[in-house]
């Protein structure tokens, strides 16, 4: 049966949890599975929490995860290694493994792994941008998936909310504002300190590195003084200039964490992500139909991004 997605649909949910791997500290990294109850198969979304690389877990984005899953998306939110346990690139290694793990497990929850995309919030947005841009980087692919060793971490699309697209600019802003905890969070994660430049999506584009550019959604609060709009808009412009497709949505009157509270702008964020995903899945179906018409195997795109490398 073909996977379809109607962003206006309504489904009941079954929510379960499963361990997906262990952090170097020994902490169980859990995955929370939001499984629509219905015919399926359903498109698949991996969700990555924020927390300045030092805090939070898979429950941080519950309101968004539930809203998306109730529209007919298999949403799986995962814990990530925190900086006090291990610095960069440990959490991005989790993400890379998590993408491959979810591709391998999606059918267990009535999901279609060929549709996989990801959602990242704040530092989770940074981590998924890094993983999506460098899906096959040996630095990030260190955790082997014995059950499916040939799977890779490529994605069809990425949606973000307040992503830390330039962690060095965010650090300088925190230093200027006297936010000692935020400054220390950056130092905890980027250790040694020069890794803040290697693991920096904006600087990667500035250096002209050869990276994968999947369709990207960036949602940004107008009043965000944590990740400033001007910094985000520079990244969006750089992503487009490098050949990537990027939808940028500014949310008037909103700060960094606006989606945590119910309201019209939170509802708008939910709908923006749904419509973005619907467009990407439609594009994927069209690409598959064109491959079939040419006599090619449309299943090949199971691990290929919708966009090409740039």
Where does each model-flagged region fall?
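Alpha/beta-hydrolase active-site loop
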Residues: 86-107
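Primarily recognizes the serine-hydrolase "nucleophile elbow" in alpha/beta-hydrolase
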Residues: 100-173
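Mobile cap/lid helix-loop segments that gate and shape the active-site cleft of serine hydrolases
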Residues: 4-10, 133, 137-141, 145, ...
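N-terminal cap/lid segment of alpha/beta-hydrolase-fold proteins
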Residues: 1-39
């Amino acid at each position: 049966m073909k996977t379809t997605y109607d962003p206006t649909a309504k489904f009941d949910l079954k929510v379960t949890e499963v361990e997906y791997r262990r952090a170097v500290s020994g902490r169980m990294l859990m995955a929370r599975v939001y499984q629509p109850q219905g015919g399926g198969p359903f498109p698949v979304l991996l969700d990555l929490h924020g927390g300045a690389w030092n805090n939070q877990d898979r429950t941080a984005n519950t309101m968004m995860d539930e809203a998306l899953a109730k529209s007919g998306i298999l949403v799986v939110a995962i814990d990530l290694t925190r900086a006090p346990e291990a610095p960069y690139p440990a959490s991005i290694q989790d993400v890379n493994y998590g993408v491959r793990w979810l591709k391998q497990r999606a059918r267990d929850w009535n999901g279609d792994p060929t549709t996989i995309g990801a959602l990242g919030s704040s530092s989770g947005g940074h981590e998924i941008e890094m993983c999506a841009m460098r899906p096959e980087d040996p630095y990030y692919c260190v955790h082997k998936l014995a059950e499916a060793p040939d799977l890779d971490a490529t994605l069809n699309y990425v949606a973000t909310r307040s992503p830390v697209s330039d962690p060095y600019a965010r650090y300088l802003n925190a230093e200027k504002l006297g936010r000692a905890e935020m400054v220390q969070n950056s130092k905890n994660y980027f250790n040694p300190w020069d890794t803040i430049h290697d693991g920096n999506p904006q600087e990667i584009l500035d250096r002209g590195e050869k990276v994968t550019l999947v369709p990207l959604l960036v949602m940004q609060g107008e009043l965000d003084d944590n990740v400033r709009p001007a910094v985000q808009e520079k990244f969006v412009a750089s992503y487009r200039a490098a050949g990537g497709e990027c939808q940028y949505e500014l949310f008037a009157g909103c700060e960094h964490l606006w989606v945590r509270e119910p309201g019209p702008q939170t509802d708008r964020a939910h709908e923006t992500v749904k419509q973005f995903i619907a467009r990407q899945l439609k594009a994927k179906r069209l690409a598959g139909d064109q491959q079939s018409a040419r006599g090619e195997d449309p299943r090949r795109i199971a691990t290929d991004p919708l966009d090409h490398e740039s």
